Amino acid sequence: MIHSLAVDLEVFENMISFTFVDVRDYLDKFADCKGALTDTLTVEEIKSRLDSVKNWIFYVTDTDDSQMLELIDFFEKMRPITKDDGTVDRYDLFGYNNQAYDDMMTRAFLMYWNRFDTSKQLCSFLKEVNNKLISLQDDKDALWNDSLLNVIRKYRLPYVTVDLFKVYALNSAGVNVDKDTGERKKYGKSLKQVSINLKWYNLLDFKLPPIDDEEGDVYRKKDEYKGMTNEQLNHLFVADFDRYLMPKYIKPMLHYNKNDVFLVCEIARQKPDEIKLRYSLGHAFKLNLLCSARSNIADKLLNKFYSERSGLKEDAFKNLRTQRTALSFKRIIFPHIKFKTKQLQDLLEEMKKVVIYRTNKDSFVREIDFYGTTYTLATGGIHTQDKPVILKSTDKYVYVHHD
């Protein structure tokens, strides 16, 4: 049996919190809804049902570790159990970018929770890990060569991760191109942006009030902030998650966190097919595909098949490459490709004469106007230059997209 929970955690200088929601219970509570919840229910009804969904919230602060053992026990109960009939009782944790962030923070917490004398020291250490993960996220080499993070990665989590950020390829929602270097960098879609697409009833962001005297006195106890005014501290602490979370702000922060976890459940409710696909393929081919986009699923299946046919372990071949400094298109255009239209015949002959080099591969671009549509051909593929438009099917016309 698989127990499905959605999870999100938050880290501050003096606090870590975990919020869990029972995914199955969430789906049952809204089983009568199709599409966005706001298309079917009033806001009051949505909030009422959400209040009845099973959830668990834990937090540990620098002054309060009363929930520590309860939280550790909650994680320990997630460890898989193989029954006498061979079935496995396990927990699958759904999240958003949880494979890269939440899992690492959870590993750090479970590894180090009992290695410090005080919860204050633990919170400080977890904030250090948090800062490393965030500061190194755009530097993959540094991220994977950091000694502390590599130690933490070795901890085996008691649950199975389902990362919806990757399942729906939202980690590569678009590409930014550096105008000076031409370097292309993929960017992801935040959970807040996704909430708009889901037509979620509560577009919530966590924002702390300006630093007041009570919070300012906490900072001024440290030598580096001694003598600073509240105004100076407000200019210094721009990011809310870098601040000391005062007890009076814990409740609104947990409410914000819970809203994010409900959003994870809502993604699964509105778009279940991609998740079901990964469970069925994973079961059929004995692979973990629960954090894989479709393209990555193809890679994993191909590696598995090649490994089985060749007898080689995956590590022996997956990083092998054929290095080419030049590539003639004529060598990769199959001879059976022919066109009846002279315009396309001319384009085909032109393409056969093209040779690209490693240094100029991004400079190859061709445009062709064909039956009223402009097509752009580049080394990355072919794309149409379409005007933004919304097309809706009716009883008379059905719009079908082919790619």
Task: Please place each PLM-identified region on the residue numbering.
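The start of beta-strands in P-loop NTPase/AAA+ ATPase cores
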Residues: 3-5, 91-92, 158, 398
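Conserved DEDDh/DEDDy metal-dependent 3′-5′ exonuclease domain
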Residues: 33-193
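Entry/capping segment at the start of metal-dependent catalytic domains
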Residues: 1-40
